[in-house]
């Protein structure tokens, strides 16, 4: 009896070793990419840029459409540029826009959603950049490194602004005409 018990225990312990794997096709993964011949690459420090916008009083805005008194500068550095590939480069900015004003990016408050403020971007000539559109102006590629300068500025989009921390998520893409 002890032999049968020992044999049974041995069989149970060995069953995972001799078990055959069973494979069931459950789905597929489609991976897609793109091979591009870009004229420039984005420098590492510009790939995940954080711009500190500062602090503003709600009474600094005179109503919907009014801008904050301060423009905050920021730059995007491009490297490994080659005029042999492309002669000009532009930057397109994309992100969520508020229904009240599609010419600015949404500025969301912590836990409140729309804070009543939008974020406007401007090029180096202080021309407003319209979100989710192709660039209106392109810079010539003259050297292997170049820095494109921009400014950001808050704009009231509502009479009702909610004080608190606010943030905007904006993505950029290099565009070659």
From Swiss-Prot:
InterPro entries: Adhesion_dom_fimbrial, Adhesion_dom_fimbrial_sf, Adhesion_dom_sf, Bact_Fimbrial_Adh_Pro
Keywords of the record: Disulfide bond, Fimbrium, Signal
Annotated signal sequence range: 1-19
Main location: other
CC terms in the record's Gene Ontology section: pilus
The UniProt record lists the keyword Membrane: no
Disulphide bond pairs: 40-81
GO biological process: cell adhesion involved in single-species biofilm formation
Cellular localisation: Fimbrium
Domain of life of the source: Bacteria
Family per similarity comment: Belongs to the fimbrial protein family.
Xref: NCBIfam families: PRK15200.1
Cited PANTHER family: FIMBRIAL SUBUNIT ELFA-RELATED (PTHR33420), FIMBRIN-LIKE PROTEIN FIMI-RELATED (PTHR33420:SF12)
The protein's name in its UniProt record: Putative fimbrin-like protein FimI
Originating species: Salmonella typhi
Gene: fimI
């Amino acid at each position: 009896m002890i032999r049968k018990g020992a044999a049974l225990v041995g069989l149970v312990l060995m069953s995972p070793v001799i078990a055959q794997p069973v494979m069931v096709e459950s789905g597929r993964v489609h991976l897609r990419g793109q091979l591009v011949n870009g004229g420039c690459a984005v420098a590492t420090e510009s790939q995940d840029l954080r711009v500190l916008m500062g602090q503003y009083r709600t009474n600094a805005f005179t109503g919907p459409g009014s801008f904050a008194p301060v423009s905050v500068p920021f730059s995007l550095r491009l490297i490994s540029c080659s005029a042999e590939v492309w002669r000009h480069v532009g930057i397109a900015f994309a992100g969520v826009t508020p229904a009240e004003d599609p010419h600015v990016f949404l500025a969301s408050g912590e836990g409140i959603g729309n804070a009543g403020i939008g974020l406007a971007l401007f090029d180096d000539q202080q021309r407003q950049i319209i979100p989710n559109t192709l660039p209106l102006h392109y810079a010539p590629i003259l050297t292997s490194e170049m820095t494109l300068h921009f400014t950001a500025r808050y704009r009231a989009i509502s009479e009702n602004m909610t004080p608190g921390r606010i943030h905007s998520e904006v993505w950029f893409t290099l565009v070659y005409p």
